[in-house]
């Protein structure tokens, strides 16, 4: 009890205003002059927590003032805020009853790092992927307009200048004026994606200015006509279109948003909270779709983050006083999977001028930085537009190039039709390098990459490989250049062992024309083992650990690195099934429709009788936590595999 009292006292001393805010209603009791102090305390709170419990730092630091202003002006949670992506939502969480739980964010059993309606009534819609906020908020706003008694309810979509370049964001913008609604879009323009922002829209926004005097003139003109009964709200749209045309005539250009009949305000300083409150109060009750354009600095309030916003997007642990980042990496020289990919892609480009690389706003995350340095003319960052990335790759392949499209597994879902229609049907030689496959850990449910095997397997002509080590990844990338069909290579987040078992290395110079194959990692044909574990990817290491543990009790288990999910190594499968009583399949992905399902389907179709136990992600949503914690939760860490082996052996 004493400790709790002391903690409360310390919090009040450290955050005198923030400690009194348990809900936005408490925030709204403060005089507007106090809001800059609230913003300062929010930043200090974010710095204090994220320095020891890492998360999305720079985005949240840049969105403090707009978050405070929105909760101050709007009656949340009755009025709804819809966050795009959610990287910037930490100030929102701190203001909406989750301050005491904030230390647990992104940890197993703690609060999520992203907005989620299951967590709080203040989180109106799931966020994690980019571009959905406008469409979701528009649906809410139109639903309110159709519901008696809710016509005056307010809905706000908060979207960044990188996210708004999404196809779905444009689709949402294009539909905002089709039906009556009171949607407000706040465009948070910080000149950044996770990496540097790209594209024509980004350049357009950088040059966009609108006279505040013009906006005042237009509102006064409308009020004048309305007072004289010359126009009413139903005719306002026609007047706005006339005003837009007049503005275009005067300025020589048309604002893209006003061209879509969206009332535009801005750009304004996104770090002047008092002014933001004034502007939001003025436009809050205006009818029809509106867009407020604010300019912010990613990482605002922390000098190191302002200088290097890409590095400080999710910087890991750091010293809150000096800004020095604290490395938790060991002395091991083991490379990360994305670095193996990035370096080998650059090496392939050195030898083959057909090689090109594509990333969707993840230059650093996918390690495409290497290709951008060595062959910038053949490296393409298309922004947050995975569908375009895939079809663009298809166009390159159709014209003789060999594109490697490096896209996170969770985000590749957004391009499913493009994979089928624009690559697979034509059999184009696009190599999909699927990063962050499997359980990704602390980013949780919106970012896990465990669906790819299940959604790619049904596509005719698309081969799928899951390397267990760096050597095999490089072999697959090199081999793909000798093929004339699409290939998907998936690999997880984290360190890539050079060789899963050194003695089984290919050794010497690898023949790029030779297709890498499945291999036995443990056991032999002579040991008469009755159980075999068939794994794909580096998760096979868990199987090897389990096999070593049961071997101490005289239980022998064979372990195979199967590598190929499609096509299956059917000859090897027949051999294994004929010499074992039970096959345990293991994958870092969904059980339903994945590698294990492929094995079961093959055995069934071939009328081969052999028990199959499938291990992987079960049919449920998996929250956030460390990867080891989540593997244990899903039942496919080494301990869980060991239990399955012991039970099978007991029952045989």
Q: Locations of the language-model features?
A:
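Generic long, charged, amphipathic alpha-helical segments
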Residues: 381, 547-548, 553-576
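Cofactor-binding active-site loop characterized by glycine-rich and histidine/acidic residues
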Residues: 56-179, 337, 355, 360, ...
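Peripheral docking tails and interdomain loops at the edges
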Residues: 318-320, 325-333, 441-443, 463, ...
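Glycine-/acidic-rich phosphate or pyrophosphate-binding loops and their flanking alpha/beta elements
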Residues: 251, 278-281, 313-314, 336-351, ...
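N-terminal amphipathic, basic-rich helices that act as targeting or association modules
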Residues: 3-95, 256-262, 269-277, 290-293
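Structural signature of the thiamine diphosphate
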Residues: 236-304, 429-434, 452-501, 513, ...
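Non-catalytic terminal/interface segments that mediate subunit docking, oligomerization
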Residues: 80, 297-412, 418-428, 485, ...
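Long, well-ordered, tryptophan-enriched scaffold segments
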Residues: 4-12, 191-341
């Amino acid at each position: 009890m004493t400790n709790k009292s002391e903690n409360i006292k310390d919090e009040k001393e450290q955050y005198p205003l923030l400690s009194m805010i348990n809900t936005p209603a408490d925030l709204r009791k403060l005089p507007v002059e106090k809001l800059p102090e609230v913003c300062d305390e929010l930043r200090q709170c974010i710095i204090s927590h994220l320095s020891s419990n890492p998360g999305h730092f720079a985005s949240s630091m840049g969105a403090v003032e707009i978050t405070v202003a929105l909760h101050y002006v709007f009656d949340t949670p009755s009025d709804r805020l819809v966050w795009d992506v959610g990287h910037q939502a930490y100030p929102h969480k701190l203001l909406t009853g989750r301050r005491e739980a904030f230390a647990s964010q992104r940890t197993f059993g703690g609060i999520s790092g992203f907005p989620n309606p299951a967590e709080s009534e203040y989180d109106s819609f799931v966020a994690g992927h980019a571009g959905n906020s406008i469409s979701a908020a528009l649906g809410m706003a139109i639903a309110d307009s159709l519901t008696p008694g809710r016509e005056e309810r307010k809905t706000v979509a908060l979207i960044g200048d990188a996210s708004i370049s999404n196809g779905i964001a444009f689709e949402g913008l294009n539909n905002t004026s089709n039906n009556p609604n009171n949607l407000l879009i706040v465009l948070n323009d910080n000149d950044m994606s996770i990496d540097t922002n790209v594209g024509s829209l980004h350049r357009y926004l950088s040059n966009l200015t609108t006279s505040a005097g013009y906006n005042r003139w237009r509102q006064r003109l409308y009020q004048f006509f309305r007072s004289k009964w010359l126009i009413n709200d139903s005719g306002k749209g026609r007047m706005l279109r006339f005003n837009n045309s007049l503005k275009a005539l005067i300025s020589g250009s048309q604002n893209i948003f006003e061209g879509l009949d969206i009332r535009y305000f801005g750009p304004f300083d996104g770090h002047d909270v008092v002014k933001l409150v004034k502007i939001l109060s003025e436009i809050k009750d205006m009818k029809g779709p509106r867009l407020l354009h604010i300019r912010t600095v990613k990482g605002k309030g922390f000098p190191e983050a302002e200088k290097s916003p890409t590095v400080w997007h999710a910087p890991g642990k750091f010293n809150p006083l000096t800004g020095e980042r604290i490395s938790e990496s060991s002395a091991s020289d083991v490379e990360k999977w994305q670095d193996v990919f990035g370096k080998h892609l650059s090496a392939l480009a050195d030898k083959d001028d057909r090689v090109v690389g594509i990333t969707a706003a993840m230059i650093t995350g996918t390690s495409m930085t290497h290709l951008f340095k060595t062959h910038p003319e053949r490296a393409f960052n298309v922004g947050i537009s995975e569908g375009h990335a895939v079809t663009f790759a298809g166009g390159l392949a159709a014209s003789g190039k060999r594109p490697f499209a490096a896209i996170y597994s969770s985000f590749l879902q957004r391009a499913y039709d493009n994979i089928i229609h624009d690559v697979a049907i034509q059999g184009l030689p696009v190599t999909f390098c699927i990063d962050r496959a499997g359980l990704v850990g602390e980013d949780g449910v919106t970012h896990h990459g465990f669906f790819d095997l299940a959604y790619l397997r049904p596509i005719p002509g698309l081969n799928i490989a899951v390397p267990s080590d760096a050597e095999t990844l490089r072999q697959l990338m090199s081999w793909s250049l000798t093929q004339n069909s699409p290939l998907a290579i998936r690999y997880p987040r984290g360190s890539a062992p050079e060789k899963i078992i050194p003695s089984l290395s290919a050794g010497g110079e690898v023949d790029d024309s030779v297709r890498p194959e499945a291999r036995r990692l443990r056991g032999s044909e002579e040991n008469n083992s009755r159980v075999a574990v068939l794994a794909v990817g580096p998760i096979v290491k868990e199987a090897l650990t389990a096999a070593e543990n049961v071997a101490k009790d005289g239980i022998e288990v064979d372990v195979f690195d199967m590598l190929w999910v499609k096509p299956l190594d059917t000859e090897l499968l027949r051999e294994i099934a004929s010499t074992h009583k039970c096959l345990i399949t293991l994958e870092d992905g969904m059980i339903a429709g994945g590698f294990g399902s492929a094995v079961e389907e093959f055995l069934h179709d071939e009328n081969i009788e052999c028990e199959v136990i499938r291990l992987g992600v079960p049919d449920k949503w998996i929250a956030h936590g460390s990867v080891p914690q989540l593997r244990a939760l899903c039942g496919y860490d080494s301990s869980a595999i060991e239990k399955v082996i012991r039970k099978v052996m007991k029952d045989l």
